[in-house]
């Protein structure tokens, strides 16, 4: 189920402060965040966030198409190695 419209998007408070500080400074740096559950807001466009995936920070450059999505969608937590080879074909 989607979040109620009257509640508005969820964003951790520290995330807004960090983004504002980088905007004021005018320097392009990666903002390290652990809040995968936060929604990407329009004021984050153009910034680069390091989203934690459980082992390291994955750099995510925010563009207009990402607004409204969650940060966690762009930082996968699992590595896919593919399905195992066919054991019957291997024996022959």
From Swiss-Prot:
Any single GO BP term: translation
A Pfam family reported for this protein in Swiss-Prot or TrEMBL: Ribosomal_S19
PROSITE patterns: RIBOSOMAL_S19
Keyword Glycoprotein belongs to the record: no
Annotated Gene Ontology cellular component terms: cytoplasm; small ribosomal subunit
GO molecular function terms noted in the UniProt entry: rRNA binding; structural constituent of ribosome
Keyword terms, alphabetized: Ribonucleoprotein, Ribosomal protein, RNA-binding, rRNA-binding
Coiled coil: none
Gene3D superfamilies listed in its UniProt record: 30s Ribosomal Protein S19, Chain A
Entries under InterPro entries matching the protein: Ribosomal_uS19, Ribosomal_uS19_bac-type, Ribosomal_uS19_CS, Ribosomal_uS19_SF
Its biological purpose: Protein S19 forms a complex with S13 that binds strongly to the 16S ribosomal RNA.
NCBIfam families given in the database record: rpsS_bact (TIGR01050)
Record family assignment: Belongs to the universal ribosomal protein uS19 family.
Full protein name: Small ribosomal subunit protein uS19
Biological source species: Rhizobium leguminosarum bv. trifolii (strain WSM2304)
Organism taxonomic ancestry: Bacteria, Pseudomonadati, Pseudomonadota, Alphaproteobacteria, Hyphomicrobiales
Gene: rpsS
């Amino acid at each position: 189920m989607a979040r109620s419209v009257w509640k508005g998007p969820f964003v951790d408070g520290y995330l807004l402060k960090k983004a504002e500080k980088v905007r004021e400074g005018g320097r392009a740096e990666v903002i390290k965040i652990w809040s995968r559950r936060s929604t990407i807001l329009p004021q984050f466009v153009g910034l680069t966030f390091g989203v934690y995936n459980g082992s390291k920070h994955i750099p995510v450059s925010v563009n207009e198409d990402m607004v409204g999505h969650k940060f966690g969608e762009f930082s996968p937590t699992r590595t896919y190695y593919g399905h195992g080879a066919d054991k019957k074909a291997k024996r022959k």
